[in-house]
A protein has these predicted regions:
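Register position in tetratricopeptide repeats
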Residues: 36-37, 70-71, 104, 138-142
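Terminal, low-structured helical/coil segments at or just beyond the last alpha-helical repeat
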Residues: 112-150
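Structural marker of alpha-solenoid helical repeat scaffolds
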Residues: 53, 87, 120-124
């Protein structure tokens, strides 16, 4: 009888653990589907819930940043991008999004630093970096000219 109870307990534990790992994956996948359907508030809730179960999931932070970008909350967007990069320093999409924010803030030094990192890790979005660097070239001389006239 004692062995039988242990077997039942072990079975319940195994089922419980497997359903927990399934739910972790399910939160992200369900959130991603909601994000694609532009249901950002619901998606944000599930991405945040996924982070509770899987705090080292850089993609959840990346998609939270994308949601905050849509909502024009740059502070939260930047925070989530920085967190995604702490977890995955080679996340080219997070690097690219941070470069765009730095460019928007006229933080050209940060754009250059991020661009140097981006060039080392880019696989799919390499052309985007060229566009950012080109716009940086067009802006910097104007800034230098205005400073020299002062």
């Amino acid at each position: 009888m004692n062995k039988f109870l242990k077997l039942i307990g072990l079975t319940l534990l195994t089922v419980s653990l497997s359903s927990t790992s399934f739910s972790k994956e399910n939160f992200f996948n369900e959130a991603l589907e909601l994000f694609k359907k532009e249901k950002y508030e619901d998606a944000r809730f599930l991405f945040e819930r996924n982070i509770v179960f899987n705090p080292k999931d850089a993609n959840s932070y990346l998609y939270l940043a994308k949601i905050y970008n849509k909502e024009e909350d740059q502070r939260k967007e930047e925070y989530n991008l920085e967190t995604a990069l702490l977890i995955d320093p080679n996340n080219e999409e997070a690097l690219l999004m941070l470069m765009k924010i730095a460019l928007e803030k006229s933080n050209y030094e940060k754009v250059k630093d991020l661009s140097d990192k981006f060039v080392k890790v880019c696989k799919n979005l390499c052309d985007e970096n060229k566009g950012i660097l080109e716009s940086l070239k067009n802006i910097e001389p104007k800034n230098n000219e205005s400073w020299s006239k002062s």
